[in-house]
Regions:
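Predominantly flavin-linked oxidoreductase catalytic cores and closely associated redox partners
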Residues: 100-103, 114-187, 191-205
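A conserved FAD-binding loop/helix module that cradles the flavin
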Residues: 292-337
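A Rossmann-like FAD-binding core segment of flavoenzymes
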Residues: 86, 90-121, 180-272, 324-336
Length: 337
């Protein structure tokens, strides 16, 4: 019997495991992928917007020789976190179901190619993030091999026609990197301009590339189908266009997957996607079932990051121990409108 099971080995899940262990709870972490799998999906040469101190966990210093760490730095740091704190992390073991009975939870898991297993726990923390659930366009051709919902690097697109779908930070950065790698870039967005939350140091650069004709842009257009060499789009007036594309990047964001929470009996707000919960403790409508990380923000994934999601663990532990919630930043009740 574990004191708690944590579902998700991202930074917020690891933070929860550390806090639980420090408080004397036995804890095991499960993830269907590797440790901090979400970060492995960042662009290969990505640099964080935050300083290293804001990404650190459990008081373990995140030391890098530059102001802001790279993707590679972060992967190395979070591996060190698991080792340093001796966390019990079961990678590549998916949680299939969570059932509450007689005051405890039965957690059913399965490793690839193996029979299911079951463990019991007094509490469960869901910290599954959202990178596994891209916002799909639901158009023909979306699953073709040259179409992806993630951007890695631009080298393979050298002298190729590429289409980038989206109007946020990921799409903007990818468009710039692909252009610098020698690709012929067309940016497609259903809106009339870029998203409001785009980073201020990215926007002028991309606007200049568009103004000089280096990057083509199609505003107010929606993708209707994807072929092997062409993306079909429809404009606001119903006009149809075929855009050459050897590679297609659908950078339209992600949404948290709440299927496991819903199947466990937790209530989910249908409009916001936020699991109903106590903002002081992050306990859901199922006693003993807690949430941490981006899932706390529902469909608005821009409200919870590593910087504030790592503090969710302190609220959860306080709730489990019957103590007043600590005054930590960035939890659900502090999310701006």
């Amino acid at each position: 019997m574990f004191g708690a099971v944590v579902v998700g080995a991202g930074p917020c899940g690891l933070a929860a495991a550390i806090a639980l262990k420090k408080a004397g709870f036995s804890a095991r972490v499960y993830d269907r992928d590797c440790v901090v799998a979400s970060i492995t999906r960042y662009p290969t040469y990505a640099t964080f917007f935050s300083t290293a101190g804001k990404l650190s966990l459990g008081g373990l210093p995140f030391v890098v020789p530059v102001a802001k760490p790279s993707r590679r730095d972060a992967l190395a740091y979070y591996r060190a976190v698991v080792t340093h704190f001796g966390l019990d992390v079961r990678q590549y073991e998916a949680v299939e179901s969570i059932t509450r009975a007689q005051g405890t939870f039965r957690v059913r898991t399965r490793r690839r190619g193996e029979e299911p297993r079951e463990v019991r726990a007094n509490a469960v923390v869901i910290a599954t993030g959202y990178w596994g659930s891209p916002n799909r366009l639901l158009v023909p051709g979306e699953d073709l091999p040259h179409v992806t919902h993630a951007y890695g690097e631009g080298h393979h697109a050298f002298q190729q026609n590429v289409a980038v779908v989206g109007g946020g930070n990921s799409a903007a950065e990818a468009a710039l990197e692909l252009w610098r790698a020698g690709a012929k870039v067309t940016l497609i967005h259903f809106g009339p301009t870029f998203d409001k939350k785009i980073k201020p140091w990215i926007l002028p650069d991309l606007e200049n590339r568009i103004a000089e004709g280096s990057v083509d842009v199609r505003w107010n257009c929606r993708v209707t189908a994807i072929d092997h060499r062409v993306v079909h789009v429809r404009g606001a007036l119903g006009d149809e266009h075929a855009i050459p594309a050897d590679h297609v990047y659908l950078l339209t964001g992600y949404s948290p997957n709440v299927d496991l929470l819903r199947a466990s009996g937790a209530a989910i707000d249908p409009e916001t996607g936020i699991p109903k919960h106590n903002p002081a403790t992050l306990e859901t409508t199922v006693p003993g079932l807690y949430i941490a990380g981006v899932v706390v923000a529902g469909f608005d994934a821009n409200k919870v990051f590593i910087e504030n999601g790592r503090y969710h663990a302190d609220r959860i532990v306080a709730g489990l121990m019957g103590r007043p919630a600590p005054d930590t930043p960035g939890v659900s009740r502090d999310l701006d409108g």
